[in-house]
Design a protein with these regions (language model features):
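A conditional alpha-helix N-cap/helix-loop micro-motif detector
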Residues: 20, 71, 94-95, 122
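Glycine-rich, Arg-bearing micro-motifs that act as flexible, cationic patches
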Residues: 112-136, 146-151
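General small-molecule cofactor/ligand-binding pocket signal
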Residues: 39-41, 89-93, 141-143
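A short acidic, amphipathic alpha-helical/loop segment
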Residues: 22-26, 100-104, 127-131
């Protein structure tokens, strides 16, 4: 008798792009369908950009100011996209290193993570995004890169898939890729 895996929240890593919007909408739909909180994460050092080592020589107070500014932008942008759905939380993470990401994304709860799959050779947290998804401890769904219906599931997300309440017309089996 295998325990049905559950999750406590849906996590989404902010990305201002077409695929980022698709991923947010998917995360929002999953939150609504499962009556779960949607956590929107923003990293001061973008985990999608594996060349980025910005903010290294900023002072602590400058980083704090930047974080506050980013969080404001984040709230404005995604509150509007979330519409009536109010169970949305925002969290700014300071570093895009693997450990910080892990700490930030696994904060106190087991989350289903939804990420924008921006392009075939996209990176996330310093490794190819499919490799990241495959190795990550939580269930991960990638959205994109070509259309919003194109979802890729890691092995942990596959176990959740039947109970997620995803709109069947929108996600045909053919679009679902197992990493």
């Amino acid at each position: 008798n295998m325990a049905i895996p559950t999750f406590n929240a849906v996590g989404f890593c902010a990305h201002y792009s077409k695929q980022g919007d698709w991923a947010f909408d998917t995360a929002l739909e999953l939150s609504k369908a499962n009556n779960k909180r949607l956590n929107v994460f923003h990293f001061l050092n973008d985990p999608f950009d594996h060349n980025e080592i910005k903010n290294r020589n900023l002072s602590h107070s400058e980083i704090e100011r930047l974080a506050i500014k980013k969080e404001k932008e984040l709230r404005l942008y995604y509150d509007e996209r979330a519409g009536e759905y109010l169970d949305v939380g925002f969290r700014v993470c300071y570093d895009n290193s693997w450990t910080e990401l892990h700490r930030c994304l696994l904060v106190r709860e087991f989350q289903l993570l939804v990420l924008a799959y921006i392009k075939e050779d996209a990176f996330f947290a310093g490794k190819p995004i499919k490799e990241f998804a495959d190795n990550f401890i939580s269930p991960v769904i990638l959205v994109g890169p070509d259309k919003p219906e194109h979802l890729s599931f890691n092995s942990r997300a596959v176990l959740l898939a039947p109970g997620l309440g995803l709109d069947k017309d929108k996600w045909q089996e053919s679009e679902i890729v197992y990493i």
